[in-house]
């Protein structure tokens, strides 16, 4: 019996249990009372609508489930950003579905709501996937209008994207299933086809109260902008539905008729489960963040038949590169090796650190995968690039820049899984959010920061104590420890995967056992979009 394995297993399974507990809370949206009120009106909730629309026997993944987590407390919170986004299948066709959650502030748009909607559109655009909008929103959340209204990546960008996506031939279908007011009224009408539910849905630029105040006209909302008005008088909407299910059934009927398009042509064969037990991941991944482990053992539990053909196996060993298949899809894997390695020259290299040789190897491997049209999968557990005179004299900045250049200019789809540490420039080189991964998710064991909590707290403590001493204050060991603990506590909260997911720095936090599904669905989505751009790294320092 391996005691460390068992300790690791217990710890990591507790993290997954906590993930499930948090997600169960998120699924309640604005709470059970608001859900009950929704049902009393004869309406389905956002999650019920999405689940009814998607093929029940097919897989689906939820994007941004933890958006808004622990944010906006002074406004009552915004669970899941007030909108549900899933990638799944409708009548066998892969789609993105976006549904406003009217149990959260009547579906009003918080800043994070806008960011999440834009992320959903970005995924649709990159992968040429049809996107379905289920609209039930009171519009912009007015107390925070200055953070959602006028900037480039704010509310207005949604409608700009509607227009651009339509010109690209990306199918957009909207169903108005509740309120659709003010600027938000443009979203369904800028879609290819728009549906509206009778009696419970309405569309107008200004509601009855505002109309009365502005021009003195007395009119009820149903007459002003209900289903009959827009389907029979204004011609704004295309289909009238008798209730939510009827609207969703009509969407299924429409999506079923969408024709097929050219594919990217990524290699796909029969899928096989890993030969190694996937549950072992929980015991392999150490509880202690600075402990060593063999990343190869993690890879074997993620890839088909546990087969991984390493590229330059004996060179640049702090990064593992090689070819495999995941659910039948060919992939090139770039993963941080977390155990201490020894080079042929006898040099010991720390796991999780990017050295000159590993950066050089990764750059070449990325180029090879682009040459062969093989999607890239990055498995992050990185503390950064090697520092010190030896590395600087060896040109670590130059070699690191080459790797970042290759990642930046890669034209094959990239997918990033943050397993453990994701620190500093290591995050960049290993395809962090800024480098356009088609999907980026974290395991519950992940941390995202400029540096580790301990390192950051020590640096910040030095700055704080120096400042206090300048003011003539005495710093006792007790006071120093109190300051350190306070700083570290604040920093630890910020490096949590939930902090990152709340701000949509990642697309979600997942059970490690769901990793294959996310990668497989991501590559299938990417296969809808042929690669049009040629791979070119531009000028390199050599």
Residue ranges and their predicted role:
Residues 1-542:
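Ligand-binding clefts of soluble mixed alpha/beta catalytic domains
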């Amino acid at each position: 019996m391996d005691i460390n394995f068992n300790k690791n297993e217990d710890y990591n399974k507790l993290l997954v249990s906590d993930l499930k507990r948090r997600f169960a809370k998120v699924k309640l949206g604005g709470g059970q009372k608001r859900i009950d009120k929704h049902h009393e009106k004869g309406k389905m909730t956002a999650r019920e609508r999405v689940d009814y629309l998607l093929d029940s026997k097919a897989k689906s993944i939820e994007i941004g489930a933890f958006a808004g987590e622990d944010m906006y407390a002074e406004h009552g919170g915004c669970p899941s950003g007030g909108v549900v986004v899933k990638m799944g299948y409708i009548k066998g066709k892969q789609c993105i579905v976006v549904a406003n959650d009217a149990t959260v502030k009547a579906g009003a748009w918080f800043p994070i709501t806008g960011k999440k909607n834009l992320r959903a559109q970005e995924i649709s655009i990159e992968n040429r996937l049809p996107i379905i909008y289920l609209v039930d929103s009171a519009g912009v959340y007015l107390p925070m209008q200055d953070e959602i209204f006028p900037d480039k990546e704010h509310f207005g960008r949604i409608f700009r994207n509607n227009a651009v996506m339509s010109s690209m031939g990306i199918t957009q279908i909207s169903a108005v299933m509740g309120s659709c007011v003010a600027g938000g009224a443009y979203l369904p009408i800028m879609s290819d086809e728009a549906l509206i539910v009778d009696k419970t849905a309405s569309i107008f630029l200004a509601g009855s109260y505002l109309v009365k105040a502005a021009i003195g006209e007395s009119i009820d909302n149903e007459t002003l902008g209900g289903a009959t008005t827009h389907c029979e008088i204004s011609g704004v909407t295309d289909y009238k539905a008798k209730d939510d299910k009827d609207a969703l059934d009509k969407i299924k009927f429409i999506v079923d008729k969408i024709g097929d398009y050219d594919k990217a042509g990524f290699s796909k064969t029969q899928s096989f489960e890993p030969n190694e037990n996937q549950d072992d991941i929980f015991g392999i991944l150490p509880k202690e963040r600075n402990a060593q482990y063999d990343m190869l053992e993690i890879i074997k539990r993620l890839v088909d038949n546990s087969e991984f053909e390493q590229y330059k196996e004996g060179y640049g060993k702090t990064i593992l590169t090689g070819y495999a298949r995941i659910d039948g899809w060919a992939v090139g894997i770039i993963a941080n090796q977390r155990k201490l390695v020894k080079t042929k020259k006898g040099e010991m290299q720390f796991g999780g650190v990017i050295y000159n040789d590993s950066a050089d190897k990764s750059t070449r491997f990325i180029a090879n995968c682009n040459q062969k049209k093989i999607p890239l999968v990055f498995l992050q557990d990185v503390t950064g690039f090697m520092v010190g005179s030896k590395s600087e004299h060896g040109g670590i900045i130059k070699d690191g820049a080459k790797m970042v250049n290759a990642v930046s200019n890669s034209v094959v789809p990239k997918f990033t899984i943050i397993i453990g540490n994701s620190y500093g420039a290591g995050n960049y080189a290993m395809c962090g959010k800024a480098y356009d991964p088609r999907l980026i998710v974290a395991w519950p064991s992940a941390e995202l920061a400029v540096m580790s909590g301990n390192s950051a707290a020590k640096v910040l403590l030095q700055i704080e104590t120096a400042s206090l001493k300048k003011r003539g204050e005495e710093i006792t060991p007790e006071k120093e420890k109190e300051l350190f603990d306070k700083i570290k506590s604040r920093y630890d909260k910020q490096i949590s995967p939930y902090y990152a997911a709340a701000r949509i720095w990642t697309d979600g936090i997942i059970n490690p056992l769901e990793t294959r599904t996310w990668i497989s669905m991501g590559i299938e989505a990417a296969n809808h979009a042929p690669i049009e751009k040629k791979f070119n790294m531009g000028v390199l320092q050599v």
